[in-house]
Amino acid sequence: SYGSRTMSNTYSMTCAQCYDETTWSFSKKADAVVLTLGTNDNVEVDKGKITYAQMKDGFKSFLLQIRTKNPSAKIVWAYGAMGNGAKDCILSVLKELGGEANGYYYVGLEYNGDGGVGHPSVAANSKNAETLAQALKKIL
């Protein structure tokens, strides 16, 4: 999260990054919603800016918000491309929400910090994209 511009309070906007607060209609129904969140949240825990419990509550609240807007979509959390610090928290929340039986899935990505500032390289992103694509084929 970055100050007041969190995913939870900008999810319903068309382009919060552009400060366009026009509400998204959600009229088109998604088959899947894929998240790749958690790295920066875990850094905030490590820095002592938020607690593990706050991170977990935030994850759960956001997933429930997504579910409200996408009641029949598979919700897929793809994580690990920049480390696995929040993995246990993510898995715990997905389990609490009923896991795959309730349409919540986890896809582990491979860590590779060969890109800029610890980000994955182009090759790693390509490999993780293939991992996610294969997982979505199975899930959908």
Q: Which stretches of residues belong to each language-model region?
A:
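Conserved SGNH/GDSL esterase-like catalytic core that processes O-acyl groups on lipids
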Residues: S1-A53, A81-D88, H119
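Conserved catalytic region of serine esterases and O-acyltransferases that act on ester linkages
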Residues: F26, W77-A78, M82, G99-A101, ...
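Structural recognition of the beta-strand scaffold that forms the well-ordered cores
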Residues: D31-T36, K74-Y79, G103-G108
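Sec-exported extracytoplasmic/periplasmic mature domains
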Residues: G38, L64-P71, K95, A133-L140
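Aromatic/hydrophobic pocket-lining residues that form the small-molecule binding cavity
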Residues: M55, F59, N125
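Generic structural signal for well-ordered alpha-helices
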Residues: F59-L63, I90-L91
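Short helix/strand-capping connector loops at secondary-structure junctions
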Residues: Y105-V117
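Histidine-centered active-site loop/cap adjacent to the catalytic His
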Residues: G116-L140
